[in-house]
Amino acid sequence: MSRTGRLLLGVAILAALFRLPGLGYPGEEYFDEVYHAKTARQYLNGEPPTEWVHPPTAKLLIAGGVALFGYEPWAWRLVPALAGILIAPVFLLLARRVLASERAALFATLLLLMDGVYLVQSRIAMTNVFAVLFQLTSMLLLLRAVAADELRVADMAALGLALGLALSTRWTSLFAWGFMGLVYLAVRRARAFRLRDLALGALSFVVLPALVYLVSYVPWMAQTHPSGLHAWWDRALAAVAWQKDIWGYHAHLDATHTYFSPWWTWPFLYRPTWYFWFSGGDFVRGIVALGNPAIWWASLPASVWALAVGIRWRDPRLVFCGAGYFLLYLPWGLSPRTLNFSHYLLEAIPYACLSLGALLDRRWNVGQAILPRAYLVAVAALFLLFLPFLTAMPVPNALWSFRFPGVPVEIGPYRVMLGGFGIWTWFPSWI
């Protein structure tokens, strides 16, 4: 096996070690599984879907595990876990294509593997992990396609299919779709407007994604058992019309939630989302979608650095990393949807990891290897610290309830308390 093959296998195994064990706990649907897992079963039973506010692809994939192994907790989480595992080698390939060295790509991949939200989303039957997988796959295929002097039909067709899967999973993939369009134009430049390139661009960015999106609704169309072509055409038109209802739902959603988090607070981890909580006897168990603080708190400055330095030094690799983060994050500020959660930032975090990988690699190259080593150790330590509440491990009540002593400090006219926080709950908003 080649070195690249060994590295890809290694990161996949590392991802699997944290995603497959204990996949059957909790033993019931929790958080949005009450919608997505249930909808997967309904597709299998030919029933109208409970959850229709996202396109069908993710629920159909979740249904694959249920079809094979029954409606069991580990079965409806199996395909999301496999998607989470697959993200690791896909991202390594993407990082290797984008970043200047293999070491930088490994830094970026290890950082992503140690992110808490990425782990939690890989162990729950929700749509987010599939969106990330298909978006990263699409970007990898795009960079491969545009690197050739002449666009190849097979490469552009593969890109179109992957983009279709991303868009038919979550509409938030439109952010990634727009970013990929900019990358395509930036790399191809004038060549993008040649007749052949225009045709292939339309195929991969419009025609095939639209076709895949429509095909994802075929199981829903078939639920009414249409007996003729005319009936199928009517159902297809109904599926198209349904998109207006999806938009209306998100645009006018005025519900409230305990863990609502404004979009501009996400990089600061102001309000992570608790998905599950159980307290019984001497132990507690919980699952919280909390990003690794060392990664999320660094994501904004690292992306600003990549964008600014990339523009100054005319380094398209760094511009790509920084722009990817902001173009997948900032559109949330324009979204009409008001009920949002911090884990939505997950789709932008891989690009922050690319920026961090590039930054760590530069420090290494100038003889400051101690800095990337110390940072990686800190990231790993925080990942292991929060791991019990990323995977619902039993934690003694005494440890959960423990609080470090607080010390009152006078700062001018203000009196603040230093300390008084828990081992896992550093701020009141984390509870």
Model-based region annotation:
Residues 1, 97-99, 138-158, 166, ...:
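Membrane-interface transmembrane helices that cradle and orient dolichyl/undecaprenyl
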Residues 30-31, 80, 117-131:
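Short acidic/glycine- and proline-prone juxtamembrane loop motifs at membrane-interface regions
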Residues 5-11, 91-114, 133, 147-154, ...:
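Transmembrane-helix signature of polytopic, membrane-embedded enzymes
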Residues 13, 74, 78-99, 137-141, ...:
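Transmembrane-helix motifs of polytopic, lipid-linked glycan transferases
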Residues 198-205, 209, 213-214, 218-223, ...:
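Transmembrane helical bundles and short interhelical boundary loops of multi-pass, membrane-embedded
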Residues 26-39, 209-265, 269, 393-413:
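Aromatic-rich transmembrane-lumenal/periplasmic boundary elements in polytopic membrane proteins
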Residues 12-18, 108-113, 120, 140, ...:
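Short helix- or helix-capping micro-motifs
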Residues 44, 90, 130-149, 155-163, ...:
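Specific aromatic-rich, kink-prone transmembrane helix
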